[in-house]
Amino acid sequence: MEPPDQCSQYMTSLLSPAVDDEKELQDMNAMVLSLTEEVKEEEEDAQPEPEQGTAAGEKLKSAGAQGGEEKDGGGEEKDGGGAGVPGHLWEGDLEGTSGSDGNVEDSDQSEKEPGQQYSRPQGAVGGLEPGNAQQPNVHAFTPLQLQELERIFQREQFPSEFLRRRLARSMNVTELAVQIWFENRRAKWRRHQRALMARNMLPFMAVGQPVMVTAAEAITAPLFISGMRDDYFWDHSHSSSLCFPMPPFPPPSLPLPLMLLPPMPPAGQAEFGPFPFVIVPSFTFPNV
């Protein structure tokens, strides 16, 4: 004979089919809810990043608002007080991130400023115009050093490299300074020589070129020289009757120097003295 407990369980299993159906329905509803939640999560993951960012921001704002309301309510419930903490933590994190971004920007600016400070002198140097280019530094020699350099220049205008190096070592200057001094001194000497040549050429340019006279004109010339005066210059009244041209005379403002004037002929040879022209022989041959 079976015990009474097993008999009661068997009887209840036979008499309660509706209870099993309700459990199956509850299990089905739970499975459907889990499937819907999974589908929603997949859709949220498939959303673009800006939308996810906005959704996360809205969630953070709502969490912060709930935390603030629960904090204002006095914190009677522990769960409410604990829920308000994450909102403040998120706000603190956001402020910390913003502060960190500001620090990063400040560090970037601090890193850029030294570069700008270093780049300013380069701009100042590179901004020079061609006309304002820096000239090489010229060493200022002492009077004794200048005398020594002049003495060497009078002896040798183009010193060798060995001599320049020895002078630079003895004067405690650079070889470049000695070379520049000799170059400037040679340029000055050339300018002085050109000025002397130009000054000596001016009187010769004022006198003019000699006149070319043929042999026939030279033979007939003494017949017309009787009108020559004692001062060796032609009279204006006789200049028109001569057959050969007169040499040009300088203007009154530029008198000839005494050293360039021709010598005065003696009184007895005034008529047949030396002539201020060149005689060119010319012969004619008879036609055969």
From Swiss-Prot:
Biased composition (Acidic residues): 39-48
Basic and acidic residues biased stretches: 68-80
UniProt KW DNA-binding keyword: yes
A single GO BP: positive regulation of gene expression
Pfam families, A to Z: Homeodomain
UniProt xrefs under SMART domains: HOX
Compartments where located: Nucleus
Effect of residue 227 to R: Found in infertile men; uncertain significance; decreased induction of target genes expression
Entry comment describing in which tissues the protein is expressed: Testis. Not detected in epididymis nor placenta. In testis, mainly expressed in germ cells, but also detected in somatic cells such as Sertoli cells, Leydig cells and peritubular cells.
Chain location of the short sequence motif Nuclear localization signal per the record: 186-195
PROSITE patterns: HOMEOBOX_1, HOMEOBOX_2
Keyword entries, A-Z: DNA-binding, Homeobox, Nucleus
Positions of the DNA-binding region: 134-193
An annotated GO cellular component: chromatin
Gene3D superfamilies hit by this protein: Homeodomain-like
GO MF assignments: DNA-binding transcription factor activity, RNA polymerase II-specific; identical protein binding; RNA polymerase II transcription regulatory region sequence-specific DNA binding; sequence-specific double-stranded DNA binding
Region (Disordered): 16-136
Source superkingdom: Eukaryota
Function text: Transcription factor maybe involved in reproductive processes. Modulates expression of target genes encoding proteins involved in processes relevant to spermatogenesis.
Family designation: Belongs to the paired-like homeobox family. PEPP subfamily.
Name of the protein: Rhox homeobox family member 2
Organism (species): Homo sapiens (Human)
